[in-house]
């Protein structure tokens, strides 16, 4: 496959208002402006794409975690199967990994009105791998700091309404939060423009 291998590395600041980190509820323990090194590599085999991730937080008494991840994407005609797994190798949390697996159909092409895509994912996320922020459009993960692990389903859809205009919707449901109250179902709808 053309451009089969890709890689990138970086070093930067990690900012979050997710709350307190590992040492307790004191303000001094809030994760803020902390250095992090990351590396990402992937290979497109043609029949599948495989990726690997690494992140290491630096110079921080509160947040010095090290995480490894792997992801796989397999197109099968108009369908796609994908998943990812992340493990925190330095945390003392009982639930130190996260994973998801999903099935999708279709492709919402920004240039072709009427095209659409639908995806469904099952997610299982441990407290030891979540530091705030998400690629989800919903706030399903906001209560994870009160529990230990969350399991839930997520359905997402995109429809191209006209060239460079898409409607996006997500619905997260069936949540089970370990050692805390289960969060309510969550949803979002957005209209997106590409310039």
Which ranges hold each PLM region?
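Mobile, glycine-rich extracellular loop/lid and propeptide segments
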Residues: 1-24, 35-41
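Short capping loops/turns at secondary-structure boundaries
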Residues: 30-34
């Amino acid at each position: 496959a053309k451009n089969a291998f890709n890689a990138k590395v970086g070093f930067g600041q990690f900012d979050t208002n997710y709350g307190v980190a590992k040492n307790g509820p004191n303000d001094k323990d809030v994760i803020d402006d902390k250095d992090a090194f990351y590396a990402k590599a992937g290979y497109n085999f043609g029949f599948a794409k495989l990726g690997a991730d690494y992140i290491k937080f630096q110079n921080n008494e509160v947040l010095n975690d090290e995480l490894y991840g792997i992801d796989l994407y397999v197109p099968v005609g108009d369908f796609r199967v994908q998943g990812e797994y992340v493990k925190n190798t330095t945390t003392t949390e009982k639930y130190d990994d996260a994973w998801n697996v999903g099935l999708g159909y279709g492709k919402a092409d920004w240039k072709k009105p009427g095209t659409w895509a639908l995806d469904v994912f099952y997610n299982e996320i441990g407290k030891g791998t979540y530091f705030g922020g998400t690629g989800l459009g919903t706030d399903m993960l906001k209560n994870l700091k009160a529990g230990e692990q969350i399991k839930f389903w997520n359905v997402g859809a995109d429809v191209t309404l006209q060239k460079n205009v898409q409607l996006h919707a997500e619905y997260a449901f069936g949540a089970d939060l370990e050692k805390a109250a289960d969060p309510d179902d969550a949803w979002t709808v957005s209209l997106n423009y590409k310039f």
